[in-house]
């Protein structure tokens, strides 16, 4: 895994999301003080999940076609999406957020 610096904790208030411009682009969410990172592109359509509708039960609804995903597992919870989103481990260290990304393949 390749650990990257995402942002300070203060940049993602509770109930909000932040787009992290890395490769791949990540959507970072704060749900009740817990942070979740998923692929920012909906698996059904070309929509940014960081612009989606965050629910208290750690799910996010795509802003384009209302597909819903679990932030913990990436599982698609309703149609029209059927494919999951990739999730990434998140670590908070000293007020900063880091995300583990897979190593780039040669």
Swiss-Prot record:
Q: Where is the Rieske domain?
A: 4-99
Listed GO MF terms: 2 iron, 2 sulfur cluster binding; 3-phenylpropionate dioxygenase activity; metal ion binding
What keywords are annotated for this sequence in UniProt?
Answer: 2Fe-2S, Aromatic hydrocarbons catabolism, Electron transport, Iron, Iron-sulfur, Metal-binding, Transport
Swiss-Prot/TrEMBL GO biological process terms:
3-phenylpropionate catabolic process
Q: Which cofactor does it need?
A: [2Fe-2S] cluster
- Subunit annotation: This dioxygenase system consists of four proteins: the two subunits of the hydroxylase component (HcaE and HcaF), a ferredoxin (HcaC) and a ferredoxin reductase (HcaD).
Per its database record, what is this protein's job? Part of the multicomponent 3-phenylpropionate dioxygenase, that converts 3-phenylpropionic acid (PP) and cinnamic acid (CI) into 3-phenylpropionate-dihydrodiol (PP-dihydrodiol) and cinnamic acid-dihydrodiol (CI-dihydrodiol), respectively. This protein seems to be a 2Fe-2S ferredoxin.
Q: Which NCBIfam families match?
A: 3PPDioc_HcaC, PRK09965.1
PANTHER family in alphabetical order: 3-PHENYLPROPIONATE_CINNAMIC ACID DIOXYGENASE FERREDOXIN SUBUNIT, FERREDOXIN-RELATED
Family note: Belongs to the bacterial ring-hydroxylating dioxygenase ferredoxin component family.
- Any idea what this protein is called? 3-phenylpropionate/cinnamic acid dioxygenase ferredoxin subunit
UniProt source species: Escherichia coli O139:H28 (strain E24377A / ETEC)
Lineage, broadest ranks: Bacteria, Pseudomonadati, Pseudomonadota, Gammaproteobacteria, Enterobacterales
């Amino acid at each position: 895994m390749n650990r990257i610096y995402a942002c300070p904790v203060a940049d993602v208030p509770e109930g909000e999301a932040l787009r992290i411009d890395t490769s791949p682009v990540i959507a970072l969410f704060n749900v009740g003080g817990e942070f979740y990172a998923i692929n920012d592109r909906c698996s059904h359509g070309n929509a940014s999940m960081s612009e989606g509708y965050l629910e208290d039960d750690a799910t996010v609804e795509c802003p384009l076609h209302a597909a819903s995903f679990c932030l913990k597992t990436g599982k698609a919870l309703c149609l029209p999406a059927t494919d999951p989103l990739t999730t990434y481990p998140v670590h908070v260290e000293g007020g900063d957020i880091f995300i583990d990304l897979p190593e780039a393949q040669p």
